[in-house]
Amino acid sequence: MSGTLLAFDFGTKSIGVAIGQRITGTARPLPAIKAQDGTPDWTLIERLLKEWQPDEIIVGLPLNMDGTEQPLTARARKFANRIHGRFGVTVTLHDERLSTVEARSGLFEQGGYRALNKGKVDSASAVIILESYFEQGY
């Protein structure tokens, strides 16, 4: 067990990616993966898994503020199930409420509107999802 985790912020056009270490509780963004109507380039995901060899994958679970599911929730679950089915790695779903808002705010502080490109926001969201997972003691 390396203690390495990959996190994905699922989206229909772009999937944010972050890598983190359980021992330090830290995460950093990786380049986002383009998706077509929620379907990623599976060869890119396979490459990420081979390169980083994570012990676990965290997929952000989009929920409404009251905790109820939204249309994207089922698609994120399906994405998580497909990762597990294709690659046999442990996949955990983690509440991602407000991660995009927090990511946008942090990126804006760093570089204004120019820093808010879609891929950067999605991968920054994946970092926040993974850090939140660590903070909850996982």
Curated annotation (Swiss-Prot):
It is found in: Cytoplasm. Its EC number is 3.1.-.-. One of its GO terms (biological process) is rRNA 5'-end processing. GO terms for molecular function: nuclease activity. Pfam families: RuvX (PF03652). The keyword Metal-binding does not apply. It is an enzyme of class 3 (hydrolase). GO terms for cellular component: cytosol. Keywords: Cytoplasm, Hydrolase, Nuclease, Ribosome biogenesis. InterPro entries: RNaseH-like_sf (IPR012337), YqgF (IPR005227), YqgF/RNaseH-like_dom (IPR006641), YqgF/RNaseH-like_dom_sf (IPR037027). Belongs to the YqgF nuclease family. HAMAP family: Nuclease_YqgF. Could be a nuclease involved in processing of the 5'-end of pre-16S rRNA. This is Putative pre-16S rRNA nuclease. It comes from Salmonella arizonae (strain ATCC BAA-731 / CDC346-86 / RSK2980).
